[in-house]
Structures are given as C-alpha cells and as structure tokens.
C-alpha cells in the first residue's frame, strides 16, 4: 500500500483498540475500512477516527552524511523500519540523499534505502559544498533532517548554517558537541532561535540513551556529582585482546577493519575520543567545561601524530615496543 494508506489504516486500528469490535473488513486496495461494534455510543469514537485518519501527514526529508560503518548500518535499519516508523508517527520519511566526502546521490522523490549504496557507487556525482547546500535549501518537504554520522570537522562547522536555514540535525559526530564552549553555545542558541532540533544522543554510549538520562536527571532537579563507566569501547577491546603475542598495531588494524575504532584510530589511541565524550556528558550534566580542561595521555608516538593512517600503521614499532614493556 502507499504510505498515506498505511498511515490511515494504522490510525484506524489504533483508534479501535479496547473497543468492543464484532467485525472488521478492509478492501484489497486498503482504502475502505469497516468496523462493526457490539455496543455504542460511537459519536466520540467516530469523531476521534475522523480527526486521526484525515489529519495531514508531514513529509520529512532525510539527508545522510556518511556511508561508512554507521551510515551503511543505518540504511539497513531504515530500509527495514521505514514503513513501520511512518505508520507509527504519521510522518512520511523520505531518504532524499546520501553524501560522502566527495560525492552525492540526491533525489527529492526519494531513494530506496535498501539499494542506496549500490546506486551510490554507480550514480553518485561529485558536488561542491555550495551546490549541495542550495539543493538542500530548495527541498520540497515540511522539514529536512541532516543525519551526520561522520567524523568531519568541515561538516560540524556547518551546523550554524543548517540551523539558520531551518534544518534539523541528528549527530553521531562528536566534534560540535565537544567544541569550545563559545562555539558550542552559538550552535545551541542557533537551533533554539529557529525552533529546530540538534539531537546528539548517538555521540556517547553507542546509541544508548545516556545523554537523555543525564539531561532528565538535571531537569528533575538532581545534581550529578560523577559519571563512571567504560568511555572507550575501542580501548577496552584492544587491551582485553592484547597479551603480547600479536603486535599492538596489528590489533589496532583489526579493530579498524572491523569498524570498532573512529575513522582515524589515532583519535581513540590519543584519548581525544574519550575527551570528547566526557565534555559532552559534563555539559549535559550542567557543567561549563572546555575540552582542554580534560587531561589525556596519548599512546600515539609523536612521529605518528601527523600524516596518513597508512603512515601510522607503517611506523608503529615504537607503539608496539612501549605496549610490550607495559
């Protein structure tokens, strides 16, 4: 059935929950719905049905930035849950674009999430930042949502522009949330001013509602004194696996290949990833904190801090040696 038909069918059956239904019928095209009740009165039920079934649906456009491990997994989930999500919320969610660092696959009519990556490889085009932004600004939807599952500073720097043009942002990218407090407040204020959402629960805890829980406690009048936990699943996995029989950099490479690290594993090994999570959580807990107030000790040898990821792996002997001794 079309999305609009699914919406209305779902709302119809939801309104009938708990009612003394004797008989139901639905036409093959899903447009006609009939329910016979054993008892009345039905005036308020019919009024509720009309209000629910015939209210206008909002169309929400989604633009996914990043098609790596998180992005590809999100596409799988969205393909599986799209119709259910739309029926439950009454919104029509349209995957309007998939964007990586060089190319874009865009369609106002919507992309098939289950085949988006295959289409991307064949049909995505190189697009500069300005033309992409103009395309987004001209969108035909009731709302446009930017899904940032990258680790891109360039994209994080665009959040102010996204807010000013009325886009919502859902972010797994930690860089904006852990930026200096001046920039952080600017971003928050920009989204509040335009009445748009900047949601970043996915930045800490692998998608568990940790940020929400912390914020709810603060809003309830609690004072949070400390938060404890394992703040790096990557480092936890590495040190659990490491027994000296395999060079440490080989384990790092395995974790990187399996998608267990940040796109640049040096962000994990240097402590930057943990620092960003701590800053985000501390701010959610009501503390005014700067990133440089978090003390970190890096495992990355000085001569490997710059250069490419390949350079890091090719010159990791010093890291192997220091971990062998520790």
Walk through the language-model features, giving the residues of each.
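Short, small-residue-biased leader/transition segments that mark boundaries at the very start
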Residues: 2-6, 326
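Short amphipathic alpha-helix segments
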Residues: 7-20
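Substrate-binding/catalytic subdomain of NAD(P)-dependent oxidoreductase enzymes
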Residues: 241-242, 249-325
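Rossmann-like NAD(P)H-binding beta-loop-alpha module
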Residues: 192-195, 199-258, 272, 280
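Rossmann-fold NAD(P)-binding glycine/threonine-rich loop
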Residues: 152-164, 174-200, 206, 211-214
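Charge-rich, low-aromatic oligomerization/scaffolding segments with amphipathic character
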Residues: 10-11, 40-56
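N-terminal glycine-/serine-/threonine-rich beta1-alpha1-beta2 phosphate-ribose binding loop
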Residues: 61-67, 71-164
């Amino acid at each position: 059935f079309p999305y609009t038909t699914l919406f209305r069918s779902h709302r119809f059956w939801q309104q009938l929950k708990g009612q003394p239904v004797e008989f139901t019928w639905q036409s093959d095209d899903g447009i006609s719905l009939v329910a016979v009740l054993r008892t009345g009165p039905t005036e308020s039920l019919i009024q509720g049905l009309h209000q629910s079934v015939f209210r206008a649906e909002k169309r929400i456009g989604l633009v996914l930035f990043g098609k790596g491990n998180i992005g590809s997994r999100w596409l799988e989930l969205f393909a599986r849950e799209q119709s259910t999500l739309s029926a439950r919320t009454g919104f029509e969610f349209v995957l309007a674009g998939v964007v990586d660092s060089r190319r874009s696959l865009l369609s106002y009519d919507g992309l098939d999430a289950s085949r988006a990556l295959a289409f991307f490889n064949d049909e995505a085009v190189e697009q500069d930042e300005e033309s992409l932004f103009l395309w987004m600004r001209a969108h035909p939807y009731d709302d446009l949502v930017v899904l940032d599952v990258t680790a891109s500073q360039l994209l994080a720097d665009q959040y102010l522009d996204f807010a000013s043009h009325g886009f919502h942002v859902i972010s797994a990218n930690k860089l904006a949330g852990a930026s200096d407090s001046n920039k952080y407040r600017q971003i928050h204020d920009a989204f509040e001013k335009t009445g748009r959402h900047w949601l970043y629960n996915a930045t800490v805890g692998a998608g568990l509602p940790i940020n929400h829980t912390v914020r709810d406690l603060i809003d309830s009048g609690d004072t949070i004194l400390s938060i404890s936990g394992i703040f790096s699943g990557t480092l936890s996995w590495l040190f659990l696996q490491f027994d000296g029989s395999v060079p440490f950099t080989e384990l790092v490479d395995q974790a990187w290949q399996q998608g267990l690290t940040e796109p640049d594993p040096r962000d994990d090994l240097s402590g930057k990833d943990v620092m960003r999570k701590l800053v985000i959580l501390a701010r959610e807990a009501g503390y005014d904190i700067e990133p440089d107030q978090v003390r970190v000790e890096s495992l990355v040898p000085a001569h490997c801090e710059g250069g490419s990821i390949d350079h890091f792996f090719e010159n990791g002997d010093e890291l192997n040696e220091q971990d062998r001794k520790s």
